Amino acid sequence: MKKLTFLLVIAGSIALAMCFLFFHASSSSIRLSKGTAARTEKKKMSENSFLTMQADCQFMKLKDPKTGLIPPGIRSRELAFTSKLPRYAEDAGQSWTWRGPTNIGGRMLCITVDIDDQNHLLAGSASGGMWESTDQGLNWHKSTAPDAEQSATCLVQDKRPGKHRTWYYGTGEMLSTTDRNISTNARTIGIGNGIYKSTDNGATWQPLAATQGASPSGLNEIFQGVWRIVTDPVRMDKDIVYAACYGAIMRSENGGISWQVALGDIENKSFATDLAITSDGVLYAGLSSFCLSVEPPGKAGIWRSTDGFNWTKITPADARSLITCSIP
């Protein structure tokens, strides 16, 4: 009897020990999985915020310590200064061969085929400027000057008879360069600086002065983000150009020399805008309700106009905030 009791005590002790070890291991596993998940989430958050922190660091290095802003036109002023510095001309008899880099276009955001020549292509990149090909894309050369704005986000050719050598490209990539979503951090947006025009079929580009001059420190000006450009295909008496910009649809009657607000709320700017025009000159515009201001934009929605001045709101009841326009 004593022997049986002794064996039962031992068996019970072993069972209790096994239960203790099982629950201890389970608890440790739970704590380990929670800790691993927390570390993974922390690492993920760090990766997502790294480029934003890097952009902020770059801004701190470039800003004027007195104003806290990056001076307007600083890139062109920098190039003008360096062009006057003394250069060392002696090459010590060495011979150099160009080895690169050659692929400096970056992400391409827009491309158009010349209406007169299907071999002639123009393409714009996020940070590498405008590029031109005359052999259906087999070879490319850069057509923007080093001191020009290198962010080419939209492109259009004037399709009126006798005007085909005129092109326009807009600057400013408004979606975040880190995750391709909407961002309120100006330093993770490819802020642009206006519209450029070519009158020699895309060989060279000139900035439209009325759209220039914004500081790259923040998103404040209309022409810092140009979503789309269209030209009036009907009017021959005036060079009418429309630009869907940050906050407004802009209109020019003289090929971009001067601009007026055609549609938009300048005080409470729509973050995203878009524009389309039919073959007979009817305009359709979309302005988002999403904005960076406290008050909502007063002109958010979808609009239609036959003259670029008078607009009729045609927004459906279930329209979303961000709007894209397209005409087949």
Where would I find each of the regions flagged by the language model?
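Extracellular glycan-interacting surfaces
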Residues: 2-328
